[in-house]
Amino acid sequence: MKAEQKHTPMMQQYLKLKAENPEILLFYRMGDFYELFYDDAKRASQLLDISLTKRGSSAGEPIPMAGVPFHAVEGYLAKLVQLGESVAICEQIGDPATSKGPVERKVVRIVTPGTVTDEALLSERLDNLIAAIYHHNGKFGYATLDVTSGRFQLTEPETEEAMMAELQRTAPRELLFPEDFEPVHLMSNRNGNRRRPVWEFELDTAKQQLNQQFGTRDLVGFGVEHASLGLCAAGCLIQYVKDTQRTALPHIRSLTFDRQDHSVILDAATRRNLEITQNLAGGTDNTLAAVLDHCSTPMGSRMLKRWLHQPMRCIDTLNNRLDAIGEIKDQGLFTDLQPTLKQIGDIERILARLALRSARPRDMARLRHAMQQLPELESLTASLTHPYLVKLAQYAAPIDEVCELLERAIKENPPVVIRDGGVIAEGYNEELDEWRKLADGATEYLEKLEADERERHGIDTLKVGYNAVHGFFIQVSRGQSHLVPPHYVRRQTLKNAERYIIPELKEHEDKVLNSKSKALALEKKLWEELFDLLMPHLEQMQNLASAVSQMDVLQNLAERADSLDYCRPTLVKDAGIHIQAGRHPVVEQVTSDPFIANPIELSPSRKMLIITGPNMGGKSTYMRQTALIALMAHIGSYVPAESAQIGSLDRIFTRIGASDDLASGRSTFMVEMTETANILHNATKNSLVLMDEIGRGTSTYDGLSLAWASAEWLATQIGAMTLFATHYFELTELPNLLPNLANVHLDAVEHGDSIAFMHAVQEGAASKSYGLAVAGLAGVPKTVIKNARTKLSQLEQLGQASDSPRPSTVDVANQLSLIPEPSEIEQALSNIDPDDLTPRQALEELYRLKKML
């Protein structure tokens, strides 16, 4: 006998459904609860902190069970999704009244971290992406999909570093990868990883899935037909989303290739160090996004973050954005736009739920409210003249047909769900109005019946009532029950009263309940038809949502530029960064002291700045503000400076700070060297490189050697625009030895035992490091500081007396290479070509080498 046959029919049904969804939690609807059994129950009780109970038995052992109330399920789902779990929702689809045996059930949706669309499960100002990754012959295919907007993209990173940068940029909530995926370390420290069968990544299968989704014969029109690795990932991704959503995906209509050469590439370390959307502690406070994002709509906020994480290289597109921001700023239009945009809200995600047919009544009400704001938006934008803004305004024009339909169809304040009706407005459908009138007329009839019966029989305690269990009834107090006429049939006895039914009331009950049932059934039918009526307008509404999002970002950046005194940057193709009175966009907002603005000049004749100065003097802030200003210019934003001319960049690299990578077993120094190696391999003459305190994680001479050699390589072999901060004073000799380098420093002034940081950038090298003064500020005991001063004096005297040459006094040849020079014999051997020597010459060379020993 099969194992399931030992169970009740209900448990047999559960086991069958669980076998179809073995790797995810199954929420099994039983009445007013979703129940979980066996290992699912144990896991859910730990994850959700709910009670673990028992039900029935299996093989002589009680079956573990846990459950959550159906009306509170969204909160529990939100917690599970946050933890990276997926959940299959199994509903009762049969009628308990007519079912023989267990009520029919089926899985109606699968909630996964990357495919959720429910408002309660999403962070409204962050994209919610699902991604798939594929690896072959050292190269990668990577696809991302935002189910809440239909945005579907693929790319093909060529190295692990580039792939890691993409994962950092997109931060997918769920990541699909094949069972034979080799670089598994890319999956570490992230929730929502999903192993998938290898065949789901086959190219032919992928093309078939994608053509089926888009209704096309091939993918040539999308420009992705040659991106084989990316298509393998995209095919797996679309199949997985279809499997989990259990419905059509009409809002996913295209696939775009995300070309790396169109963007300024930021690697994972750069995104982290510049604190673009996440600070070093993992939060969102004091980040660039926190300063710039005052968008009026959640969808605008999400778009701004995408711009920040993917700065552009196309100067024409960036100038269009800058022109648009300038026009809105000059007209002060953002003041009027913001309240109107706020009323429009997050229609992008409402449209996704509409496409998936999971929208709720209040989604429709919000969509109606958004549509009602469009005439006001049209009026406000009528004065705009820039072609980019005019085009956005055209896409955001009112859609009268949709607005009128929703105004006619949906009540002013509909309930949360359609389940109990009350959603469709009066006057929308004549038949529905008639059934409702019949059902609503019950109140008048019951009041009249109660008055008539009370007067006819002289029972002043007589009342007519209704409850869901017993239906309509006539209630009489126990003290007057003797006055009840014979045709009253007792239905229920209470402690102080009796309840009766009479034929007339029973007939009315049948009529009312039938009319309510008919009204509800018709209302649900009309609700489904409403989706069909709206679907032809879906693409137009999605274009509208995109246009409103862009308008929101542009007006937001105009407001930020106006409020924070930003200037318009000049974008040029030639390499170089020229900034007058530049400021750090975040630090200037959070510091209590006046922020000291500083200039920077980088050009082909001044490609590297060696930056010295005291710790806490502002070197890192100066470097970061340069990178952030360049990044802001490359999203088309105004920047915090008096003036700025920014040359086109291909990459921004940062090597700032480090900590142990315990998960990978890498020390601080190893992390530092890995990031340095990435820069030295991948930077180009069009890159901006920030190098801060290279070599501090090892011995003094090793560190100095590495810092010197790295700076020399960047200057002579790569020619990248570089800011090189160092505490090795010896490196200030480099500008004297190599072309196109310069020294700058941040100054400080000592007063006795105290120190004042000036935070102003000056030309030339710093005179000293002020390390002991900073230690005193940090609270190091005065006795320790005093001993340190004594030791410093001794070391300085020792250094002056030493015969060993300092890097600042050795000749140029030695200073350019801190690696030990080859010996005379090694040099002589390297100059000998044995194939060019006769036997006699070879013997003579051997005697000559012997004399060198």
Swiss-Prot record:
Q: Does the keyword Oxidoreductase apply?
A: no
Q: Which Pfam families match?
A: MutS_I (PF01624), MutS_II (PF05188), MutS_III (PF05192), MutS_IV (PF05190), MutS_V (PF00488)
| Binding sites annotated in the UniProt record for ATP | G613, P614, N615, M616, G617, G618, K619, S620
Task: Kindly state which keywords UniProt assigns to this record, in alphabetical order.
Answer: ATP-binding, DNA damage, DNA repair, DNA-binding, Nucleotide-binding
Q: Which GO terms describe its molecular function?
A: ATP binding; ATP-dependent DNA damage sensor activity; damaged DNA binding; mismatched DNA binding
Record-linked SUPFAM superfamilies = DNA repair protein MutS, domain I, DNA repair protein MutS, domain II, DNA repair protein MutS, domain III, P-loop containing nucleoside triphosphate hydrolases
Instruction: Give the CC-aspect GO terms.
Output: cytosol
User: Family, per the entry?
Assistant: Belongs to the DNA mismatch repair MutS family.
The protein in question is named DNA mismatch repair protein MutS
Q: Which organism is it from?
A: Vibrio parahaemolyticus serotype O3:K6 (strain RIMD 2210633)
